[in-house]
Amino acid sequence: MAANGTAPVGVSKNIKQIGRIDLPGGGSVVVENGFAYVGHMDPPHGTSIIDVKDPKNPKIVAHLEISEGLHSHKVRVSGDVMLINYERYKAKQELPSGLKIFDISNKSKPREIAFYKTHGKGVHRFTFDGRYAYISPTMEGYNGNIAVVLDMKNPEKPEEVCRWWMPGQWTAGGETATWHGLATRCHHPIRKGDRLYISYWHGGFAIVDISDMSNPKTVSTLDWSPPYPCPTHTTLPMLNKIMERDWMIVTDEEVGEKLNETHNAFLWVVDITKETLPLPVATFIVPFDGKSTNEFRFGAHQPAEQVYGNTLYVTWFGGGLRAVDFSNPYIPKEVGYYIPQPGKGQKVVMSNDVFHDKDGKLYLMDRYEGLEILESEV
């Protein structure tokens, strides 16, 4: 797929573009009821709301800006409520950090209704089901991001329900980390049923029982970093049993430019039938003989978290979007791909996030520039 240290662009298999809009680079995209919501990577760009009811002619209907020193690159929506993260850069300790809540009943005029303030850097990636927000904030007394569940029954007054952390993070409680710096920290939780599946960067992942949400209990943890160097980014449970077993797809994030020379990050298939003993049984990787740099990465990142069957769509940075069939979880099979042209004014592709709408359309956000609307023939 990629040879001589270069990656192809403008190629596809079983996935085609039906629309595109020039936008500043984004960290996340979600779609609901004909509107796409994009969290941008860098200030002053904060969040864009785009009318995508005509996918061939998407139109921006609102754009929120953000102060220098912050970014709000993650967004989630349910009904008339929109949540965006406020995460600050190290040099701007005086700026507020946390989770901002908006009323979006008027899509062209988002109205702030609450701000859940956190300590330190703020909130990274998170999920939201309309009632609860599952967030990854930095909190006072803890080393690095932890997992927190907020009750959003009244979105104007979010209330903490519970928190969970890896042993060693609660420094105010006398715990001592066994790792260096902030290597072990929550990336984001995903809920399925009464379980949270929590990616934990260089701490691997955790499965947490929230059947009693006021008292979360660890079911199991697993960490393969080291020996594998790239951090765990997303832990996504499959919708149904496959081959009469339960499965979770885990992506590590390609950050090779920050590490010694390594194989590019890839995807793991984990058997969670016995959830106290999660067992990796297979991997999926896109071959590449080049190197990641500060400007260009090639490796796994983020799957579409909307799961409808056995095929998942996964962003691969410079490798674009990959469609992977897990009908046989022991032998994951690529069944399609889409690698865009570089965005306006850009030299490389960095496919960062993807949303899979229930009507089948895919929304692919580039880290540098542009939102693509796609159709899959898979």
Show the residue positions of the predicted features.
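Feature marking well-ordered beta-strand scaffolds used for ligand recognition
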Residues: M1-V378
